[in-house]
Amino acid sequence: MYLRKYINKKTKEIFEATPFLKINEKQILEYIYNNNGVCSIRDDNTLDIITVENKFIIKDEHVVIEESEHKYHANFGDIILRNIYKEGVYAFKVCTQEELRNEYSIKIWEK
């Protein structure tokens, strides 16, 4: 419960400080680094992303994340795993909460 309250408080603060942002990979990562891993970003569809460690949890109906030449489609509740490579290239992998649970045997915080 504490985690949920903390996340809600942090995302509210970021929402108020960020009236409009067009989503892209660089902005997502910058916000994550600048806000201690908790992030809420608005685009035309009011995207809400919460991060825990290196996982993005999509809190909106649908979002497309563009990363170099690839586009990743994610839906509500999906998790996006982020890998960082030495060359500074970022890669994203979309998976569902169930897939992540099965792979890592962990309980994912849900809305």
Can you describe what each PLM-predicted range is?
Residues 1-68:
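N-terminal domain-onset segments
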Residues 67-111:
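Short, compact, well-ordered microdomains
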